[in-house]
Amino acid sequence: MSNPEIVIVVAMAANNVIGRDGDMPWKLSTDLKRFKALTLGKPLVMGRKTFESVGGKPLPGRPHVIVSRGAEIAMPGVSMARSLEEALERAREIAIETGVDEVCIAGGGEIYRQALPFADVLHVTHVDAEVDGDTVFPEIDPALFEKVQETPVPAGEKDNYPTRYAVYRRRTAA
């Protein structure tokens, strides 16, 4: 099997905000369903604070690789890594062992910033709002990533805002 693609999955506001006080600054049930569909069965890389923000236990059906310089988390379905590079290496091994073609990056802000140079694909939920927050996603450089798909999604009854699902693919060197 070839090397699995590195896929970032993120929801961000129009002003690039992705978090506030260790949580997402919106409720988007529709987007959570999309996140599950995109990541199910695939290794999920996230930082320790993000892991704690999703309940401190693995999301079902996805092997987790948690990046932490200090805390050790010992539980089934969770591997630990001291750096993003180590986490990506472990997640790639898991992907190859389990026969999946993607490794998913699920945040938070620092992990996204470090992972962007390695990413092949970005699955971005653009939240049609500007919100206050303390964590932002880096600018997506159109010279590096081409938007290959965008779908408007009206706000459902359990969503604070309408969104647009976009897929960006890394441009290949000419």
What are these regions (language model features)?
Residues 2-174:
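Enzymes that bind and transform nitrogen-containing heteroaromatic metabolites
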